[in-house]
Amino acid sequence: HGFTPWFETGFYIFTSSRNGDGVDWVGDHIRPRFSIPEKWHWPVGLSISNEIGYQRHAFSPDTWTWEIRPIIDKKLGRWYAAFNPAFDRSFHGSGVSKGFEFSPNFKFSYDFTPKIAGGLEYYGALGPVTGFDPLKDQQQQIFPAIDLNFSPRWEFNFGVGVGATRGTDHLIAKMILGYRFDF
C-alpha cells in the first residue's frame, strides 16, 4: 500500500460470478498513486493514479487498458465526498480507435459509526473525449454502498448497482476487500 505518505501502489485481482458459470478470473490491474501529503493541509485531498491492466476478452473487448484518474475528496465531519474524473484508453481491442474516454465517478457517504459508512456511488462511461456517445449508449450506474473499516489495515466495500441507461448492466453487485501493507 503506502511506500511514503505521498505514494502508494494498489494491485487488483478481478473476478466474476455469473449464475450457472461459477467464479472466473477476469484480469489484473496495478495502480500507482501519488497524493498531496496531508501535512500540507490543503482544503481538499488531491491525488492522481495511473492504472494499467489486463482483462480477458471474454469479459471485455479491450484486453489491455490504461486509466488516468485524478481524485479530489473531502471529509467534513461524518460526511465524505469524492469526485474522480477518469480518462481511459484501450491499448488492445475494439476501443483503440476511440482514444481517451471520459469516465466520471462520484461518491457521497456518511459515517454511521467509526467503522460503518453508507452512501451512494456513481460510475459513468460517457464515451470519447472528442464527442460523447449518445445517452442510450453511455454506461451510467448508481450504487447504494456500504463501507466497513474493520481496522486501519482492512477495508471492505459492497454495493449493488442499478444501470440508468440501455448501454449499462441493469443490475450488478461489487465488492472490494482491501488490505494495506507497510513497506
Q: Model-predicted segments: where are they?
A:
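Transmembrane beta-barrel domains of Gram-negative outer membranes and organellar outer membranes
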Residues: H1-F183
